[in-house]
């Protein structure tokens, strides 16, 4: 991971203070966290400071640290760790982040970088003459299916061509960036296929509506079936089973009187051995 440091002292402002509106927002944000956990608001407060000034200054880091009762080094660690925080001045009207990861690169990200070099500056993190525009190459921004794409502040502009990116940069430079609709720049809806859906186009089946009278008549015609014991476990035993004529306890005594094919068993004769 590359080392991230604060900007030179020559460009650092002497002080930082939230605007009245942002100060009220910051106080409300801090109160959302439990007592003793207020330091968890460090990331949203740093992000709001960046939105206000365009980048995170040393004075902003110190101000946020004082608000949260944190050591300066702890807030500095957060600001330098996350690449979403800009640590040096960027364009006041647009900072273009060009995705250069594999999907976007295969779809033409290099051509978008050429446009940035042409329209803004030859090197990343370099302001144009008016200080209104800057650019950088970043890693994946999560819109791979709509590659290539760029992010300007919080908005993504996808399915770009070099010509379309050039038009977008011109609009931001003219102070009309809010007029550019973010998202796919072609006839695509979010991440749907180009040209529209190719599947799931059949209309949903409409369930046939039945009258209450017909449903009631059908219910009356239904034959009631008595409950079945098929699924119930058997609790019958040799003693309680009604299909057995003689209980198990009396079988030995009853065997003396059993007749086999009309003949009485003679106990005086030895029993035949089984073959």
UniProtKB/Swiss-Prot annotation:
| Disulfide bonding pattern of the chain | none
Q: What is its EC number?
A: 7.1.1.-
Q: Where is the composition biased (Basic and acidic residues)?
A: 206-221, 258-269
Q: Where does [2Fe-2S] cluster bind?
A: 99, 104, 140, 144
Report the cofactor remark. Answer: Binds 1 [2Fe-2S] cluster.
| Catalysis performed (reactions) | a quinone + NADH + 5 H(+)(in) = a quinol + NAD(+) + 4 H(+)(out)
Annotated keywords: 2Fe-2S, Iron, Iron-sulfur, Metal-binding, NAD, Quinone, Translocase, Ubiquinone
* Biased composition, class Low complexity, residue ranges: 243-256
Query: Biased-composition ranges for Polar residues?
Result: 231-242
User: Positions of the region Disordered?
Assistant: 200-275
Pfam families named among the record's database cross-references: 2Fe-2S_thioredx
List, alphabetically, the Gene3D superfamilies matched: Glutaredoxin (3.40.30.10), NADH-quinone oxidoreductase subunit E (1.10.10.1590)
Under the heading CDD domains, the entry gives: TRX_Fd_NuoE
Required cofactors, per record?
[2Fe-2S] cluster
Family annotation (InterPro entries): NuoE-like, NuoE_dom, NuoE_N, Thioredoxin-like_sf
Q: Which GO terms describe its molecular function?
A: 2 iron, 2 sulfur cluster binding; metal ion binding; NADH dehydrogenase activity; quinone binding
PROSITE patterns the record matches? COMPLEX1_24K
Q: What does this protein do?
A: NDH-1 shuttles electrons from NADH, via FMN and iron-sulfur (Fe-S) centers, to quinones in the respiratory chain. The immediate electron acceptor for the enzyme in this species is believed to be ubiquinone. Couples the redox reaction to proton translocation (for every two electrons transferred, four hydrogen ions are translocated across the cytoplasmic membrane), and thus conserves the redox energy in a proton gradient.
The family assignment reads: Belongs to the complex I 24 kDa subunit family.
The protein's name: NADH-quinone oxidoreductase subunit E 1
The gene name reads nuoE1
């Amino acid at each position: 991971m590359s080392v991230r440091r604060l900007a030179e002292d020559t460009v650092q402002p002497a002080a930082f203070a939230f605007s009245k509106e942002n100060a009220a927002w910051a106080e409300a944000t801090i109160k959302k966290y439990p007592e003793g956990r207020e330091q968890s608001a460090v990331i949203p407060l740093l992000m709001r400071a960046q939105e206000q000034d365009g980048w995170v200054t040393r004075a902003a880091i110190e101000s946020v640290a004082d608000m949260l009762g944190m050591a300066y080094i702890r807030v500095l660690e957060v600001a330098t760790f996350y690449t979403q925080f800009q640590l040096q001045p960027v364009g006041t009207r647009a900072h273009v982040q060009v995705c250069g990861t594999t999907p976007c690169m295969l779809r033409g990200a290099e051509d978008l970088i050429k446009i940035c070099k042409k329209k803004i500056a030859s090197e990343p993190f370099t302001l144009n003459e008016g200080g209104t525009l800057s650019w950088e190459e970043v890693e994946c921004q999560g819109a791979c299916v709509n590659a290539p794409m760029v992010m300007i502040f919080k908005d993504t502009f996808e399915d770009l061509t070099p010509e379309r990116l050039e038009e977008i940069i011109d609009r931001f430079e003219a102070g009309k960036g809010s007029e550019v609709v973010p998202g796919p720049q072609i006839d695509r809806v979010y991440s749907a296929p180009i040209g529209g859906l190719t599947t799931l186009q059949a209309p949903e089946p409409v369930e046939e509506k039945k009258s209450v009278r017909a449903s009631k008549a059908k219910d009356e015609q239904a034959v009631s079936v008595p409950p079945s014991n098929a699924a119930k476990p058997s609790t019958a035993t040799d003693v309680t089973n009604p299909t057995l004529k003689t209980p198990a306890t009396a079988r030995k005594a009853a065997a003396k009187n059993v007749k086999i094919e009309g003949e009485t068993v003679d106990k005086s004769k030895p029993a035949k051995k089984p073959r």
